[in-house]
Amino acid sequence: MFDFDTVIDRRAIPDEKWARYAGRDILPMWVADMDFATAQPILDALHARIDQKVFGYAGPWQSLIDTVVQSIEHDHDWRIDPDWLVWLPGVVTGFNVACAIAGEPGDGVLTATPVYPPFLHAPANTGRTLQTVALVEDGNQWGWDWDAVDAAIDARTRMLLLCNPHNPVGRVFTRDELTALAERAEAHDLIVCSDDIHCGLVLDGTHTPIAALNESIARRSITLMAPSKTWNIAPLYAGFAIIPDASLRKRYQRAMHGLIPYPNVLGLVATEAAYRDGDPWRRALIDYLRGNRDRVVDAIAAIPGLRTTRPEATYLAWIDCRDAGLTDPAAFFEDHGIGLSDGRHFGAPPGFVRLNFGCPRQTLDEGLRRIAAAMTAQHPGYA
């Protein structure tokens, strides 16, 4: 019913993912956008709006708001009030605004590394101080070192900046983990800003927004969502914050005033279509991504010197190359025809790369073949 196998030639259009390696035989599997055609209901809605031929000013309209509220309740068992919504051009904007209201200049924003690179820059962008705590791997999965979390929170800390589901390690944090974070936020009077942009791409288990745990944590929460990653429409620039507490919401909106533009009207059209009509496509996508995820995990397990954990969400695999003797694995793999994200950009120590498996199987299999061939060339005894 849905076609995820057709390879679309993206080299003909000026997009960031493929333009990076223009004219070079390097397969781009780095930045987090997928190589699939956008869901037809979204394309139809965009065409219908364009065919009106007039682009007037338009804020979020009632049917859009109702659709988002209903979708969040259906997908995440979280009933929100429409008044809690603050519309944004994207979640990166959203967590930068959150940092701007976290205490005073110089105060701390704590996040767990490795993490989506803009997390590492948002505190400094707003005059705050970045504080980090490293996630730890137990051999099978990444998680929290609670003693390290407690040690990282100090008198300066004003906000916990959370990524859930997590980019790049692919975790969907459990209710117990989220409860432990919420307890620390309440004990230290921290705002919790949670980037949940990948919540529609859960491959195993279910996603729980931290604000949905209870009213107490909801009152200190800013939850960021968007359809952009799930339906592959990030450049349409539309998302939203969910802020239950009226006082916190007013502070957030004041920080936005005069600086943050309204979402793109076509982005809002696409958002309504995605949440209203895009779920069959999304479910088929998740099934396809599960197959891709399993291909990646199996292929990496078969290559000596490389290892990865099984992502519970997203279309991203976090690959540990430290046992392969590579000083710069991202550059090494580029030299062998495969473009991956450099793990150092995520606040990780040297030796990690991130692979985007949101692509047709033909593309993925070629990428995995190139990775295996590169390792065989580096270590002929691996063959």
Q: Which residue ranges define each predicted feature?
A:
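N-terminal small-domain helix-loop-helix segment of the aminotransferase-like
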Residues: 2-90, 97, 274-277, 378, ...
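A non-catalytic, amphipathic alpha-helix used as a structural packing/dimerization or gating element
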Residues: 52, 63, 67, 247, ...
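Conserved core of the PLP fold type I
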Residues: 55-183, 200-201, 207-216, 369, ...
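Helix C-cap/helix->beta junction micro-motif
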Residues: 126, 187-188, 217, 303, ...
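Conserved core segment of the aminotransferase class I/II
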Residues: 215, 219-290
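PLP-dependent enzyme catalytic core of the Aspartate aminotransferase-like
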Residues: 217, 328-331, 335-341, 346-383
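Conserved glycine-rich beta-strand-loop-beta hairpin in the small C-terminal domain of fold type I
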Residues: 272, 288-297, 308-321, 349
